[in-house]
Amino acid sequence: FIGHMEGVPKSLRRSMEETTKQSEANTGLNLQVAINYGSRLEITEAVKKIALDVKEGRLAADDITEDLIGKSLYTSRLPDPELLIRTGGEMRLSNYLLWQSAYTEIFITQTLWPDFTPECFDQAIDEFKRRHRRWGGD
């Protein structure tokens, strides 16, 4: 579960924490459930945490790296996404995983989410497999 959890009822947060704990040893696919999530807020909270560590002497400014920022995000335990499937033909990220999506391949389909079928998913995967990933290079 990722997102700003203030305002989420405590009983639901406990259930979310229990579910996370029960599944932490699982292998395979990662499922992210975003609740009250916004990437700008996520980055802002990470920067505030790092700034407080610098202010209180636990961290030097020269120690701030991309890796440290990444480890301060909600998704610190998860790999960055390799593929983002955007349904409904929307040509925007909508404030979703902005930091983590730096090198993510994006597949855009006109199909709306409720109509997205296993065949649509296969089409996205097939296109992804044909791409040459450059990780920001030429």
Label each PLM-derived region with a short phrase:
Residues 1-138:
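Flexible, compositionally biased loop and terminal segments
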